[in-house]
Amino acid sequence: LDLDADNLRLRVQGVEWPYHAKAYVMLHKPAGTECSQKPSTYPSIYTLLPTPLRQRPCKSAIQGVQAVGRLDQDTTGLLLLSDDGHFIHRMSSPKKHVPKVYRVTTKHLVDDQQIAKLLAGVVLDDDPKPVRAAACIAIDSQCLDLTLTEGKYHQVKRMLAAVGNRVEALHRSRIGTLELPPDLEPGHWKWLSAEDLLRLSPVP
């Protein structure tokens, strides 16, 4: 029996559901949500996903799609989820140097000296090796686009604190060359297309 998987449609609880051998989705994470299956204070991002995504069969002990990395509860923006372990590892490993762009709103004015320090590298309290921004572009006097290729705990907030400023709002707008679509509302999700996945490939 031959099946055309590309055009296969399933019905889950009466709702038509396209077949995907592996799930790759993006979520516009809203503020006040946790990237955890067992949240401690705020609602879980997984409650924003439909049951078929949360309960997809998986070889690991945990069912369903998993977040590729994490965003703090107050951070908004582009979040990837998948049930492909190799994809999750490739996208979250610091060795792969996948660029991630954050729109940062600061409490104090951003000056050229602060930008220079972020680009040159700052030392965080848990690592003597300086961490630096791959790019830092001032949008206005209290807003900048910061590009990182690694993901330490609270990294953006700690980097801004290290140069004498403070993060007031944080939004991830891009991973690789994949941008968060302007029409994807907070709390909504969509399947990644083949073109989207190519935009997540490492930059040569």
Which residue ranges define each predicted feature?
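Basic, flexible Lys/Arg- and Gly-enriched helix-loop patches that mediate nucleic-acid binding at interfaces
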Residues: 1-204
